[in-house]
Amino acid sequence: MKQKLFLFLLLLYTTTKLNATNSLLSKSPFSASLELSTKYIWRGIEYGTAPTVFPMIGYGYKGFNAFAMGGYAIDGSHQEVDLGVSYSSSEFTIGVSDYYYPSAVGEKDGYFKLNNRNTGHWVEAYATWTGTKIPLWITLSSYIFGADKNEEGKQMYSSYAEVGYTYSFNDDNNIALCVGANLNKGFYTGYQSGFNVVNINAKYSTAFKFGNYKLPVSASYVLNPYKNKSFFTMSLYFGI
């Protein structure tokens, strides 16, 4: 009980400090954030077996954005290092992201081993349309380089499409619903099947208020019809 109380007070203190810092740095093009999640689920796929920490730093200027992010399960079952750049204009965003998984590629792999035949990197290109008059988004993405290969070593260009809608009750309460599908015989279906719905997600986001400070939180229910799996996760967010 004392440990739970200590953890709560620590989170409250951290949130207070980060919000205070945020007010001072609101005009900076740089940002930093930390997400704590009970489980890492992305596009209907489970990564790791334990709560996961996601530190991230970013830079944004006149539509250009760059980021570096990590993902670390507390039991060591998953590690991830991501880099990305994107450009947004009006309702459209295009970008490229690099995903690297030290826990999955083995000791023989190296971060700077960039030969496409045996690299551990997964490089993805994507485009997103986000409506300004209606709260709808559409994303198309495809792995274009790296470890996205079948057993024969063939580059599979695994592609994914997602359509989502956000309904806002007020500034601090909204629910987002989305459906995502694998478009070809690729990674999302273990290279075994073509078009399939792999991600149905309902996410509720709100913020706990402590005086003038807010702690953003979210809860998500995720269903992967192809794998016949469902998940429920919760996350806390801290940012400067």
Give the predicted meaning of each segment.
Residues 44-48, 78-82, 105-113, 148-155, ...:
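Outer-membrane beta-barrel translocator domains and adjoining extracellular loop/strand segments
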Residues 21-29, 95, 130-135, 168-176, ...:
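Short loop/turn motifs that connect adjacent beta-strands in outer-membrane beta-barrel proteins
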Residues 113-186:
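Detector for outer-membrane/organellar transmembrane beta-barrel domains
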Residues 28, 49-53, 60, 77-81, ...:
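Residues that define the transmembrane beta-barrel architecture of outer-membrane proteins
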Residues 34-40, 63-74, 94-102, 109-111, ...:
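Transmembrane beta-strand segments that form the barrel wall of outer-membrane beta-barrel proteins
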Residues 20-73:
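Short glycine/proline- and aromatic-enriched beta-strand/turn motifs that initiate or cap beta-hairpins
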Residues 1-29:
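Cleavable N-terminal export/targeting peptides
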Residues 202-208, 228-240:
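Outer-membrane beta-barrel "beta-signal"
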